[in-house]
Amino acid sequence: METPAGESSARGYGPPPAPAPAAERKKSHRAPSPARPKDVAGWSLAKGRRGTGPGSATACGTASSARPDKKGRAVAPGTRGTGPRVAGVRTGVRAKGRPRPGTGPRPPPPPPSLTDSSSEVSDCASEEARQLGLELALSSDAESAAGGPAGTRTGQPPQPAQSGQQPPRPPASPDEPSVAASSVGSSRLPLSASLAFSDLTEEMLDCGPGGLVRELEELRSENDYLKDEIEELRAEMLEMRDVYMEEDVYQLQELRQQLDQASKTCRILQYRLRKAERRSLRAAQTGQVDGELIRGLEQDVKVSKDISMRLHKELEVVEKKRMRLEEENEGLRQRLIETELAKQVLQTELDRPREHSLKKRGTRSLGKTDKKPTAQEDSADLKCQLHFAKEESALMCKKLTKLAKENDSMKEELLKYRSLYGDLDAALSAEELADAPHSRETELKVHLKLVEEEANLLSRRIVELEVENRGLRAEMDDMKDHGGGGGPEARLAFSSLGGECGESLAELRRHLQFVEEEAELLRRSSAELEDQNKLLLNELAKYRSEHELDVTLSEDSCSVLSEPSQEELAAAKLQIGELSGKVKKLQYENRVLLSNLQRCDLASCQSTRPMLETDAEAGDSAQCVPAPLGETLEPHAARLCRAREAEALPGLREQAALVSKAIDVLVADANGFSVGLRLCLDNECADLRLHEAPDNSEGPRDAKLIHAILVRLSVLQQELNAFTRKADVALGSSGKEQPEPFPALPALGSQGPAKEIMLSKDLGSDFQPPDFRDLLEWEPRIREAFRTGDLESKPDPSRNFRPYRAEDNDSYASEIKDLQLVLAEAHDSLRGLQEQLSQERQLRKEEADSFNQKMVQLKEDQQRALLRREFELQSLSLQRRLEQKFWSQEKNILVQESQQFKHNFLLLFMKLRWFLKRWRQGKVLPSEEDDFLEVNSMKELYLLMEEEEMNAQHSDNKACTGESWTQNTPNECIKTLADMKVTLKELCWLLQDERRGLTELQQQFAKAKATWETERAELKGHASQMELKAGKGASERPGPDWKAALQREREEQQHLLAESYSAVMELTRQLQLSERHWSQEKLQLVERLQGEKQQVEQQVKELQNRLSQLQKAAEPWVLKHSDMEKQDNSWKEARSEKTHDKEGVSEAELGGTGLKRTKSVSSMSEFESLLDCSPYLAGGDARNKKLPNGPAFAFVSTEPVEPEKDAKEKAGLSTRDCSHIGSLACQEPAGRQMQRSYTAPDKTGIRVYYSPPVARRLGVPVVHDKEGKILIEPGFLFTTAKPKESAEADGLAESSYSRWLCNFSRQRLDGGSGASTSGSGPAFPALHDFEMSGNMSDDMKEITNCVRQAMRSGSLERKVKNTSSQTVGVATVGTQTIRTVSVGLQTDPPRSSLHSKSWSPRSSSLVSVRSKQISSSLDKVHSRIERPCCSPKYGSPKLQRRSVSKLDSTKDRSLWNLHQGKQNGSAWARSTTTRDSPVLRNINDGLSSLFSVVEHSGSTESVWKLGMSEARTKPEPPKYGIVQEFFRNVCGRAPSPTTAAGEESCKKPEPLSPASYHQPEGVSRILNKKAAKAGGSEEVRPTMLSQVGKDGILRDGDGSLILPSEDAVCDCSAQSLASCFIRPSRNTIRHSPSKCRLHPSESGWGGEERAAPQ
């Protein structure tokens, strides 16, 4: 085909080549599109444009002579110098075309021509365009005589390639129109347009030269090109649709997989449902409800609901995304169509100037003006037609997109319909052969669903029968139990009843056996269906592979298989599909019939029926095989079963006879069928055999199969006959004992399956689908024989079944004729099938032709792969941008959600901590809030954060830096999560404790209720007895009033009981909270004590050495001044002055110093010398220095007393200060103190009080130095009493005696510690200037002497357990004129200057001061006192006082958790009364001392069990009444004055916070009233310390706080006078929760919240 075309083009006059071979030549590498419809006529593709190549362009030749290209065409050399030409149409449409510059010099471009060698000249649709282009190029080069090589060769003759070519052909050429018409034969224009074009061509050829003709040809070629472009775009759109269809197919497959998974899940849930039903039936039978099962099921239901909701939400989201993407794709398609239309409009606009120039040039070349209007009109018509064609193409594109969408939707609906209902077409066409396995698969699925439903029904029936069986067994057991104790009569009754039970049991067993058989049958059928499904899938894969192989072979060889092979393949596939479907249907019907037969047998016979065992391989034969009887019954039950079986034996015999008759009918039908088959094969069916069985072996194989079936039926009939005979024998001997009814059945059961297996093995090769063709004809007859039951004739057991006998000819003649008629009908149907096959052959030929055409088109489509790839890349890039945009939005949303989650998580954490804190403190949450963990505003969060930061201030000893609370680092998140985990664990522990307590309370309540019910019953009994005894007198009583009074009294008692019960519960809860808190605090204290013990021991050693040296250096001075002070007689002067008692505390930083020995002081001189030699008193030369640990000092002053009233008793003021410079410097003025209750909890409801130190009740004394600063002295702080008129001067009005004592104390302290003090007062005179010893009595001097001796006995000093000391001074004025001063020492625990950052400054001490004031028990008092220190007339103190606890003060117990310590001692060790102190045991001097001074030393030997020692002054006889005497006995000291007297001369301080510490109101009010009465009648007591406010916190004149460190922690110095009669019930070492190292977050909250319950 190519050679003539090349020759004609070389000569120049031949017709152009046909376009189809050219297209076939160019599109040889195109792969077939898998989803393009090939059968629709409207989808056929036009010829594509030619591909660019070296031989398809005419401007690429560089030689001067013509040379043939690869296609066989010649290229003119004159086209070298034509220069670049513009092809207007293709430059607009093919925007992606790249110019190919020619080689060699080029002249300036001439006017635009029709062809363009630089922009895909080869894309033209016909060879005529090339010819005309060459001619027009030569003519244009001749006209434009430029200075190029083309101009020089204008007049030269053409090259050899053009030599044979004529100048423009004559216009009258008769074959020119036909050539033009044939060149546009493939055009899409209608026939009228083509005829118009041919007429126009003839007219133009007649009118003038070939200019107009060339123009028309160019327009036609452009029209063809544009149509090809439209087809190309249409094909690309189809390919794009195919790509999207593939994605939809993948999604559909995934959805199917999900559907399969959901169906599996549904089956599992159905199984669980059945299991639950069984459980519910069991529960209904037993009457017990499984609570765990119900809870588990409820949980499963909740989980499943949540999962389903989540899955529905995800499906909705995916559906929304899919709809959005489809909308975007639709919009993109619309935009693509619009851009194509815009490009076409622009192309037309660009064509207009080129057409103008062509018209002008054509008019110049033709030179005829009369034909010009006609040409213009024709060109205008052509343009209009072209424009209309473009618009029509745009509309077609739109319609095409709509049709593609509709096609996709219809395909999806069709697939759904097929997946649900299967293929409903009865006849399968050739195209649907590949889909035949799908239809079979759907059919099998339907069958499987039916089988599963039947299995479900059977399983439910099994459950019901099991329940019924259990009920019957229970009845049998009851009957056995009732009949076991009786005699023979009971046994006979039981046997009669047992017969009925045996019958029901046998019936139930038969039912159960039947159900098991059907279940086994269903299992086999399901297994067979699965195997068949696998086989069908394998066949489908094989057919698909064969189909693909056929397609590839046809693609490679461009031919299809031969017609006979295609015919045979189609016929074989059809037959295989039909026969396999029929076989499966028949097998299923056979199984259904067998199950129906079993049910009929079960309904007919009332005894044990034989099992029906199905041959699963053949699928069409059944055999009656009995089953074993199961477990053996008891002897009497066995006899009853035998009787029942004997009664049922006639029924079994009748059933066996029916089965044997059915076998006779089957054998008779089979014999007639075999004879008719042979006759048909011999006479009429030879042609049918040739068509049906190509191997000519079908007849013998059918005969073999029928013979095998008949043999098996004969064996079964023989066995049935034997059973019938034995049954007759058994029925004949009915008078004898009933024999076993089925003696031959075991042999039968053992023989049948073996024969079946042998037969199935022998005939396994014959059971092929072709062999079942004839078998299908007589199987319905067998079923019909079973249904009609036409079994009247009695079978002959000795009959031998032959294929054919002469005596049976008459009986079988009619059947043979019937069979012949049936075979004739089958022959006719086969002829019809042959005709259909011939038609199929014809269709196959047509399909082969269409297939060849499609292959050509596919090869052409291969050249368009580049453009398609570009479209795909554009779509992919667009999709990628859309995905990037979508994921960026998702990322932003996720970031916002994560930030919101962090924010909410922090809110939840803060709320949870707040809740735990309040719960630990025993506070009740507000009930009106729905969710206490919900934080509704940022304000609430910042309030919580502020509280947290304040607590962090106290714990870290730093001010709040105001940092932002949001930390975005991973470490902060991990820390927050860890804290949340710890908080949740604590919450879980608390909840467990609450639950445990709740269960205990419930048990207690139940016990109490039970006891109350018993008591109520007893009381009712007593009341009834009393009423009976009263008799008639009861009727005379006023009934209603008496009952109403009793009712009111009962209601009041119930109300009181409820109140007391609620109070007891509250007390119990607070007690548990306190015990839990104090157990934690004890562990933390022990841990810290062990950590700091080594440091304290080191300091103890150093200070002990230093003290021992200082004591040795001070001994000569003590001896010298003791002699001088004996002659001193200045006691009256000291009495005349208004002296002030100074009480101080010496708490140096010692770890091991203890109280050594107590000595009596007989005179003031000895007391002065004792004070001079004391290592804790500083000298005046070291005032301006500080102690090593930097303790601050303060001078203590008291309120004045009126001078005209003598004080009979003055309360000793004991002040303490544990603060150091470091802790005092960072102490905030707004720091809070922890309130402590001095009430030890007692489970019996009795509150036991202990006595705190005096400084804890009255506060720390406050003075100012010269600069106005506050000074707190931790050493000896002696309290002084000054007159009221000197109250304005504050510290300057102190007496010289008190100033001397203070100065001397500081000097000794400096001397003992090797440092100096920061003293702020003037130098004070010596003690002998007061001349106090002149008026001393002998007792006083003896006391002073005792004190001196105690000061000297340093080598015999001993140690106590508590390691620091405190002096208590009490000034008492008796009825005589002698004023005595008693100085006692109390011990305080060691302190350390080491502070942890996580501990509050208020918790800087090692051990709480309270550990010294709590004794082990109020019942344990030291009794080994050698001699009392005071006169016996005042009696010994009462060592145990208890007062009834009140319900309104239970809030004070919430902070208590006292544990038994290792110390032993008395609770009176803190008291400073004049009664004999039980701690002063082992004192050797026999004098009654009013000055009892205990010296400090570094020795560590211990004598006392309790680390406290005090001296007490003698009080006046009791004359204040019962209440005051009670207070005196409990507190151990005289009642202190009221706070009103102290508040007269000081500012009233404002409370620290709403959570400030309160005074016990009831006790303080009584104390204040009694003290005021006593002071008004006799004297005014020393008032409380100045600057003590209602909240018990010390303030200076400006209201600023003075917070000693240790006292502030334990809140021991901020209590009112009422707490003085509170005593401990056990000894402990305790500190506040703010000291807890493990709970730093609660340190700031505890003090604020624990006082809130008031």
Curated annotation (Swiss-Prot):
GO terms for biological process: cell division; chromosome segregation; insulin receptor signaling pathway; negative regulation of gluconeogenesis; regulation of autophagy. The modification Phosphoserine is found at residues 1165, 1251. The record marks 922-923 as: Cleavage. Induction: Up-regulated by adiponectin in primary hepatocytes through the insulin signaling pathway. Down-regulated by amino-imidazole carboxamide riboside (AICAR), an AMPK activator that potentiated insulin secretion. Expressed in liver (at protein level). Residues 1-188, 348-379, 1122-1146, 1427-1450, 1537-1560, 1627-1654 are annotated as: Disordered. Residues 1122-1145 have a biased composition (Basic and acidic residues). Residues 1628-1638 have a biased composition (Basic residues). Residues 102-113 have a biased composition (Pro residues). Residues 1406-1505 are annotated as: KR-rich domain required for microtubules binding. GO terms for cellular component: extracellular space; Golgi membrane; microtubule; midbody. Residues 209-238 are annotated as: Required for association with Golgi apparatus membrane. InterPro entries: MTCL1-3, SOGA1/2-like_CC, SOGA_CC. Keywords: Cell cycle, Cell division, Coiled coil, Cytoplasm, Cytoskeleton, Golgi apparatus, Membrane, Mitosis, Phosphoprotein, Secreted. Residues 216-279, 308-349, 448-546, 816-843, 1079-1113 form a coiled coil. It is found in: Cytoplasm, Cytoskeleton; Golgi apparatus membrane; Midbody. Residues 55-66, 132-147 have a biased composition (Low complexity). Its main location: cytoplasm. Proteolytically cleaved into a C-terminal SOGA 25 kDa form that is detected in plasma. Proteolytically cleaved in primary hepatocytes into a C-terminal SOGA 80 kDa form. It holds the Pfam family SOGA. Interacts with CLASP2. Interacts with CLASP1. The C-terminal SOGA 25 kDa form occurs as a monomer. Associates with the Golgi membrane through the N-terminal coiled-coil region and directly binds microtubules through the C-terminal domain. Microtubule-associated factor that enables integration of the centrosomal and Golgi-associated microtubules on the Golgi membrane, supporting directional migration. Preferentially acts on the perinuclear microtubules accumulated around the Golgi. Associates with the Golgi membrane through the N-terminal coiled-coil region and directly binds microtubules through the C-terminal domain. Required for faithful chromosome segregation during mitosis. Regulates autophagy by playing a role in the reduction of glucose production in an adiponectin- and insulin-dependent manner. Belongs to the MTCL family. This is Microtubule cross-linking factor 2. It comes from Mus musculus. The lineage of its organism: Eukaryota, Metazoa, Chordata, Craniata, Vertebrata.
